[in-house]
Each structure stands twice: as structure tokens, then as C-alpha cells.
Amino acid sequence: MSNVGTPRTAQEIQQDWDTNPRWNGITRDYTAEQVAELQGSVVEEHTLAKRGAEILWDAVSAEGDDYINALGALTGNQAVQQVRAGLKAVYLSGWQVAGDANLAGHTYPDQSLYPANSVPNVVRRINNALLRADEIARVEGDTSVDNWLVPIVADGEAGFGGALNVYELQKGMITAGAAGTHWEDQLASEKKCGHLGGKVLIPTQQHIRTLNSARLAADVANTPTVVIARTDAEAATLITSDVDERDRPFITGERTAEGYYHVKPGLEPCIARAKSYAPYADMIWMETGTPDLELAKKFAEGVRSEFPDQLLSYNCSPSFNWSAHLEADEIAKFQKELGAMGFKFQFITLAGFHSLNYGMFDLAYGYAREGMPAFVDLQNREFKAAEERGFTAVKHQREVGAGYFDTIATTVDPNSSTTALKGSTEEGQFH
């Protein structure tokens, strides 16, 4: 019988937890025996998820002030362009999936209204696009990108329910090839974008269960997925319950018609929650309303006063009016200063949405008024980018793999006369 997929024993799992530096400082509220019991008799090998998680962790845990910055991708092709341009990770936000990439096929606000497996579906699509780009590059002998399969950090939102929902969603993320996932401490049924009003927190202990469940799913899958805890306590004014004594200093005593308790928002509850989440999370993210380095510094110092090695994440959000808050020189050094504070993963959540919408609007605006010159201007800018910066998608047939599949065709039949690129307008006109 084959040994492929043989599950780890409880002893092997425990030894990994005890000796692997990857797990320094990580708490699990379950045992190695329980993980072994949940594995089944065959454990699938999640190559992309495991490889991506290792790359991501090595990058964010490296000593020094270096950081990884990423843009939110909405499509597979956007992710390919990001990697081609030099980025080392891809971010996938639930907001963008809600807005234009969910399995319901509708446009939604960021309120967890779409099918729960939509984000894993887009993770898979992005990985498929990156795999194809890698295959094309290998056939062409193109070594300009050293790693096409960069880590993907994906949005688990508030988990779409309780601990079991989180477990299943995390499994789906891993199967799709996500390297990291983040989970926010909002009530799933009332979940809102971090920059909307009406956010309702769950008790601290309940979110620890969320993080614990996400970690358990990764352990059962034998994948070192990077688990990121997000707190929305900086702006949230409601909480479901006063059951957790750690939350009580911030509860005002007033209640709403729905039975929720009012809480005091701000930095202090964020730090308190982050300290509670730290043993269960690889990284921590405080959602904020403005690009405020002083606030970020106070948060980092507050958390690291108790957990000095805690890694942090930061949302460089498009919901901020950056130029209204900061001068150009401050914007230029913003991420570098965050990196020095320990914010080792920084991302622009909705970059894909804004790039896609403005790019098409700008082209359509010109085309509606000028006709063909508007598109030709775009094409000429593509040619220039190809010549000066390594942009390749101006050759659109090549970009989607026509040459790669020609290689397959001629491998099967060396005398094939039906290859696609030979004799194409692209071959003749796009040199």
C-alpha cells in the first residue's frame, strides 16, 4: 500500500509544536491527540498553501525593519500583473469579492452577504492564473520573475457563523492554496466593512474560539497557515454580551433594542483585545479610521509591552483620504515607518477595485468622446511599458497561454499545422 498521505501521529505533531521555532509563543486549546484523531486515514498535500505559508512566514518574521506590502487583487490577471511588476504577495479582500467576484454573481456591500465559499473560489482562481503564468514563463525561458506562486493572504471576514463555520472556511482556504487568513472580532450576522458604522463586537473569548478553530483546521491539514487576528474595537460601539470580564471595563451599561451593549471604542480596547489574541495569532491587525502613525505606534508599543515579538499587520486603506491627512513626503515614508514599528505585512485592500473601475472609466470616457484615439493611446502606453518596465500583457494571446498550448500541441504531434500563434496578427504586428 502507498505511504502517500499518511497522517502524522500525535507524537509527531507534538514534537513539531515543541521543537519547531515556527510555533514559538503559539497557544492551542486542544491537544495533538485531538488533531491526530480528526485527520482521517489520508491527509491531502496542500502544496500551494504550505509553500505559500512558509514563504510568507519567513518574510514577515525576518529580523529588521523590512516588510511585505501587497495590493488587493480582484481577478487572476490582476494578481499576475502584480507579481510581474515585482510584488511578493497578493491580498484578497472579502470587500472586493462581495463587490464583484462572488459566487452569487451579484454586487454586494461588505456585509458577508455572499456565499461563504466565494473567497476560497477566488483564491483558487488567482493561484490558477499564477500557475499558468509560471508555466508560460518556463516554456519561454523567461526568468525575470523568480517566484510566480507568491503567498496569498485571504479574508475570512467574521467567519460566516460560529467556530464550525470558521473551521470549514479555513479548510476551504487551505484547499484553494491560501498562505494566510485573517479573522475579525465582529458578530458575523451583523458584519460590516471596517470603515462602515454599526459594527458589533463579539466577546473576547468568542473570538479566541474563532482563532483556535482556524488554527485547528490548519493543523489537521498539516499546513502552517499564517493566522491573523483583526480587531475592530477602535470604532465599534456595540458588543453582543458582557459575559467576558476582559470586556467589562469598556461596557457602558446601556443597551440597544436588539439587546446589544454599548462599548467605548478607541485604542485602549484594541490593545486589550490584541493582548488576549496574541497567544493564538501569528499577526494582529487593528482596523483604523485614518492613516495615523502615532496611533499605530501606540498600538504597537501597547501590544509589545507584553508580547515583544508580536508581528503586526496594517490596512493602508483606500477608505482613507490620504492626501487630506498627510503631506506627500509623509505618504512616501509611511510604510517604511510602519515596518520599523513591527507592521510586517501591509496591504491596500481595495486596490483591484479602484484600479479596475478607474482604468475602465478613463478609457470609456475618452472612447465615448474621441473614438479610436482613446484606445490607441492606451495601447501605446502598453507598448512603452513593455519596452521600459517589462509589461507583457500587450501581447494578449501570449499572455493567456496560446504559445504554451502550442507547445503542448507540438509535443503531442511535432508535425501539427494548427498551432495558434503562428500566423496570428499578434505574431505579425506585436514585436
Swiss-Prot record:
Q: Does the keyword Magnesium apply?
A: yes
Q: Which InterPro entries match?
A: ICL/PEPM, Isocitrate_lyase, Isocitrate_lyase_ph_CS, Pyrv/PenolPyrv_kinase-like_dom, Pyrv_kinase-like_dom_sf
Keyword tags? Glyoxylate bypass, Lyase, Magnesium, Metal-binding, Tricarboxylic acid cycle
Q: Which reaction does it catalyse?
A: D-threo-isocitrate = glyoxylate + succinate
**Which residue positions are annotated as catalytic?**
C193 (proton acceptor)
Q: Where does this protein hold Mg(2+)?
A: D155
Q: Tell me yes or no: is Repeat among this UniProt entry's keywords.
A: no
Molecular function in Gene Ontology: isocitrate lyase activity; metal ion binding
Which Gene Ontology BP terms does the record give? glyoxylate cycle; tricarboxylic acid cycle
Show the SUPFAM superfamilies listed in the entry: Phosphoenolpyruvate/pyruvate domain
- Report residue spans for region: Disordered: 1-21
Query: Pathway involvement?
Result: Carbohydrate metabolism; glyoxylate cycle; (S)-malate from isocitrate: step 1/2
Its family?
Answer: Belongs to the isocitrate lyase/PEP mutase superfamily. Isocitrate lyase family.
What function is annotated for this protein?
Involved in the metabolic adaptation in response to environmental changes. Catalyzes the reversible formation of succinate and glyoxylate from isocitrate, a key step of the glyoxylate cycle, which operates as an anaplerotic route for replenishing the tricarboxylic acid cycle during growth on fatty acid substrates.
| Protein's name according to its UniProt entry | Isocitrate lyase
Q: What organism does this protein naturally occur in?
A: Corynebacterium efficiens (strain DSM 44549 / YS-314 / AJ 12310 / JCM 11189 / NBRC 100395)
Gene encoding this polypeptide? aceA
